């Protein structure tokens, strides 16, 4: 997993309180990791904070899995 | 009206996590007060508070992870976490874990708070100013709202009856017990999980009550002496944190399922002072009327009372006004009644106070013992009423009344008594 992928995984484990093994690229935040709609809003905020970038609402709507987040941040991360 | 009994108790107080842990230390005359060490106090007049004892969960300590998932703890202010802790204890104690639709629909929640998520609101206001609205968590609002204590408890335990919350400052806990009992009496629920929770020990909380000149300021170096109701050297209350929750149940429902029955809630009185936002009227007529109404509701005379758990916060003005109202209520019966303020040991838990004190009243009946008013070295006035100075005392307790009075001139009195058939 990429360095950005590792950082994404760490945030997801911390915020959703899930086992690290479950946080794989194909895992859906809502369907596989038990997040609700408010959790996903907070996750996006945590990504913004960690990677120093803004994730607009229309982009956030396309981030449904761990892999989606990693892919987006590999392109857009500023820190 | 249908009869309402107490079948479960749960508490988290500055004296311990759990009813047994707290009660043992109350009866031993311990104080839960210490120097504030979680934030800067050098510029605050009051520097003492009654913290819940955090630890690994052993020896009566509070381990948050035993009561709420860490990921959920992050989303809420502590009063909700404390409510979750006390509510689980109470439901386990009552052995009431409703699973069927019928049982879930018949079980409600009424857990209030005086202030709710003050700390989280203060921190988020700073975040908003410094970083802007995009940094505000989606959990900011649902984690601070007072009724979310009831909300979280109802979700955790599948309680689908009335989902309500009381907000009446320092009489919240007593109003919650009284109002929840009333919902059962009127048939809106068979079981209610009722009480209060508070987490006010923060810089803004202490600063706010200091500004209102409500807190003790003269015992910063001897914190365990700071809360001293009725004593001539008292100089304000000591802030406390925690939660108290009771499981209230319709009498026949409790009997049918063979539940352990602690006591019956027979009296409840409420009144307003219509006088001042923070001070009671000098004649204490609001407290007098709420006590009188509770006696009337219970069908009792003042001479039937054995124990009164006083509001008694250790403020200069309030203690003597309440005492005067109680003397007027009791008349010639004053010498047979014991009245103590357990706030001398726990500090003032604001919205949780009335709930933990209703529990102490129930335990006084169960064990035929009255808890002490600690630090009462020199009463500021003479009274025929036994104020139970320093040490607990064995005595018959069949009828107990608990008083709670709040800012805004709101008063509540709850009477619990030994169950008779």
UniProtKB/Swiss-Prot annotation, chain A:
GO biological process, one term: lipid A biosynthetic process
SMART domains: PKS_PP
InterPro entries: ACP (IPR003231), ACP-like_sf (IPR036736), PKS_PP-bd (IPR020806), PP-bd_ACP (IPR009081), Ppantetheine_attach_site (IPR006162)
Pathway membership, UniProt: Lipid metabolism; fatty acid biosynthesis
Gene Ontology cellular-component terms listed: cytosol; membrane
PTM: 4'-phosphopantetheine is transferred from CoA to a specific serine of apo-ACP by AcpS. This modification is essential for activity because fatty acids are bound in thioester linkage to the sulfhydryl of the prosthetic group.
Highest taxon in the source lineage: Bacteria
Coiled coil spans: none
Protein name, UniProt field: Acyl carrier protein
Organism the protein comes from: Nitrobacter winogradskyi (strain ATCC 25391 / DSM 10237 / CIP 104748 / NCIMB 11846 / Nb-255)
């Amino acid at each position: 997993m990429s360095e950005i992928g590792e950082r994404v995984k760490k945030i997801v484990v911390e915020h959703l309180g899930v086992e690290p093994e479950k946080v794989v690229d194909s895992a859906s935040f809502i369907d596989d990791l038990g997040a609700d709609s408010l959790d996903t809003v907070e996750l996006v905020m945590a990504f913004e904070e960690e990677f120093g970038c803004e994730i607009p609402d229309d982009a956030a709507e396309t981030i449904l899995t761990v892999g989606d987040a990693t892919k987006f941040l590999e392109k857009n991360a500023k820190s | 009206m249908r009869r309402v009994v107490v079948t479960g108790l749960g508490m988290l107080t500055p004296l311990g996590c759990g009813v047994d842990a707290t009660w043992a230390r109350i009866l031993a005359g311990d104080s839960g007060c210490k120097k504030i060490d979680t934030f800067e106090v050098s510029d605050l007049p009051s520097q003492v508070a009654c913290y819940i004892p955090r630890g690994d969960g052993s020896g009566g300590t509070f381990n948050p992870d035993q009561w709420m998932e860490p990921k959920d703890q992050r989303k809420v202010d502590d009063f909700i976490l404390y409510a979750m802790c006390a509510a689980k204890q109470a439901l386990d104690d009552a052995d009431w874990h409703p699973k069927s639709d019928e049982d879930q629909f018949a079980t409600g929640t009424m857990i209030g708070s005086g202030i709710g998520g003050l700390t989280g609101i203060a921190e988020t206001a700073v975040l908003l100013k410094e970083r802007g609205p995009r940094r505000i968590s989606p959990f900011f609002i649902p984690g601070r709202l007072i009724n979310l204590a009831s909300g979280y408890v109802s979700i955790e335990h599948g309680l689908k009856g009335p989902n309500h919350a009381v907000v009446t400052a320092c009489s919240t806990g007593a109003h919650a017990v009284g109002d929840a009992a009333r919902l059962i009496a009127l048939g809106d629920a068979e079981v209610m999980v009722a009480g209060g929770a508070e987490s006010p020990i923060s810089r803004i909380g202490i600063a706010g009550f200091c500004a209102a000149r409500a807190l003790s300021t003269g015992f910063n170096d001897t914190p365990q002496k700071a809360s001293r109701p009725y004593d001539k050297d008292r100089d304000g209350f000591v802030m406390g944190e925690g939660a108290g929750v009771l499981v209230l149940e319709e009498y026949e429902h409790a009997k049918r399922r063979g539940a352990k029955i602690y006591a019956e809630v027979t009296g409840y009185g409420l009144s307003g002072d219509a006088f001042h936002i923070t001070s009671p009227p000098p004649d204490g007529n609001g407290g007098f009327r709420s006590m009188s109404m509770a006696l009337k509701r219970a069908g009792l005379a003042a001479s039937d009372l054995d124990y009164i758990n006083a509001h008694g916060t250790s403020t200069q003005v309030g203690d003597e006004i309440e005492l005067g109202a109680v003397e007027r209520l009791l008349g010639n019966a004053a010498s047979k009644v014991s009245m103590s303020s357990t706030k001398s040991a726990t500090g003032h838990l604001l919205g949780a106070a009335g709930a933990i004190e209703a529990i102490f009243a129930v335990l006084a009946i169960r064990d035929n013992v009255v808890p002490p008013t600690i630090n009462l070295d020199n009463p500021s006035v003479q009274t025929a009423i036994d104020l139970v100075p320093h040490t607990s005392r064995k005595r018959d307790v069949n009828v107990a009344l608990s008083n709670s009075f709040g800012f805004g001139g709101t008063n509540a009195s709850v009477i619990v008594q030994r169950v008779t058939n």
